[in-house]
């Protein structure tokens, strides 16, 4: 990472020159709008032309923490931070989020172009990060028809169940193998992330492992570990406030090193994904495949109104990667944080265990059809989503016209960031917001649902750009936590009375991976072999 004062001064000088010329040109073409009499949302003092770029390039890292600290200092739920010619609008209020994502959904239904999203979508070929337009509409139709429909959800039930079984098998095998020891320590971060990766690979490719997996076949091998770690690397850089996102012509400098990191991670993901796609395409073209078995097959056989393939090979590869990115993050992060909080609060863990024993019993494992009756377990998941979101912001929205939000002027082209952590930890919305308390979700709801319409929690967002995989994501996360709770008794590692639940400074993951002692609590015949 470059840390040279002369280089930074040189870059800022170039930036000033370029932005001066651009602003003069912009003034010639700017239309007069009545909304321009309104003020922008409150924000920090900014430099002429370059705005607050020096702040995000300097010591205010990570930028998302600086933004939330700034909003707290300004005592505002909506702010405006100018980065070169771009107005970045963070929001930490569910009321304002509803205005943006529901009332003015059409105004904010597109996405900005960023370095990270360009890489992960292979040049904007996918549904989640693609700006509004014909390509987005096409990909949305395909994903809605072949991935997120009720029929597809049921089609993938067995694959999801197989991986929930494998999770229990993986942990139990380690317990049996080490039965002579006084305790068995499980790397829960590894377990829950690989569960999510396994489900993604099983639904997409029909496989659990790229290679042989671990020695006993239930755990990940080096290939799966690299695959999932690379997916998480891409996720943490999707909107990382890279300089090139606001000054594209400086992208060649890669000042923060973001592009190198993302390109390497995407290369690793493609190294594993693309050969499977190429092989499957060949099987369909050679007539060896007759019936679809997974999401990849569904993409390949999708046809347009003329009977021609809807998706190109490159579009298939891009959408496969995006769906994997969307599958691995929320379930694993919520489960790791949820387990850590519940191990530290045995009374909460005990209530969840008692609910599962009452609804399911102890002679079989939890299955998805049990989930509607496991409200307390689902409340634990929802509380993990609220208090410990996987990312500080949703993917950015961009305003397609000048508009007014909460009485403030929002210029066309603004990047609007709905804050998951800001809303989930907002003391005006939640009593004792930093306390893990599943009961708060049971007082007014007879049925707990992660996708909250009031947007007091931002889990799957809302509107045209809301997450399309709500059913899959919810089922995966509920099953993951339920199986961990039902199958094993969990304690901190020896010598520790509590789990360290410190949050990483650079992101919202646990600062240290979760390790805990697992002891099987069911009869041996219940565990998959």
Curated annotation (Swiss-Prot):
Subcellular location: Endoplasmic reticulum membrane
Record keywords: Endoplasmic reticulum, Heme, Iron, Membrane, Metal-binding, Monooxygenase, Oxidoreductase, Transmembrane, Transmembrane helix
GO biological process: one example: secondary metabolite biosynthetic process
Annotated disulfide bonds: none
Database matches in Pfam families: p450
GO molecular function, one term: L-phenylalanine N-monooxygenase activity
Entries under PANTHER family matching the protein: CYTOCHROME P450 98A9 (PTHR47944), OS09G0441700 PROTEIN (PTHR47944:SF4)
Function: Converts L-phenylalanine into phenylacetaldoxime, the precursor of benzylglucosinolate (glucotropeolin).
Name of the protein in its database record: Phenylalanine N-monooxygenase
Organism field: Arabidopsis thaliana
